[in-house]
Amino acid sequence: MTPVHFSFSSAFILGLMGLAFHRTHLLSALLCLEGMMLSLFIALALWALQFESTGFSTAPMLLLAFSACEASTGLALLVATARTHGTDRLQNLNLLQC
């Protein structure tokens, strides 16, 4: 495993561990998801450069577009829950009561 692959894998795993262990606030969960998506984007962009093919060059842009949609949806949910519940703590959110 090259140092570049190790750094991107460790960045993804750190984001995943942050998502698993620090799930107290919705904002911290969204930041961990964004870190995971950023590491995937950089790894996919380097993978497309490595193969030097035009077919692989659209995949990072597609991932970036989905990441932007995910971020906007997450922020909209964060604003909606902060307005209705008064906090962004994930323990206070119950799908049966919403």
Curated annotation (Swiss-Prot):
Keyword Cell inner membrane set for record: no
Bilayer topology term: Multi-pass membrane protein
Catalytic activity: a ubiquinone + NADH + 5 H(+)(in) = a ubiquinol + NAD(+) + 4 H(+)(out)
Molecular function GO labels: NADH dehydrogenase (ubiquinone) activity
GO biological process, one term: ATP synthesis coupled electron transport
Class in the EC hierarchy, top level: translocase
Annotated Gene Ontology cellular component terms: mitochondrial membrane; respiratory chain complex I
Transmembrane segments: 1-21, 29-49, 59-79
Key words, A-Z: Electron transport, Membrane, Mitochondrion, NAD, Respiratory chain, Translocase, Transmembrane, Transmembrane helix, Transport, Ubiquinone
EC number(s) per entry: 7.1.1.2
Main localization category: mitochondrion
Cellular localisation: Mitochondrion membrane
Pfam assignment, any one: Oxidored_q2
Function: Core subunit of the mitochondrial membrane respiratory chain NADH dehydrogenase (Complex I) which catalyzes electron transfer from NADH through the respiratory chain, using ubiquinone as an electron acceptor. Part of the enzyme membrane arm which is embedded in the lipid bilayer and involved in proton translocation.
Family: Belongs to the complex I subunit 4L family.
Protein name, UniProt field: NADH-ubiquinone oxidoreductase chain 4L
Species, as recorded: Carassius auratus
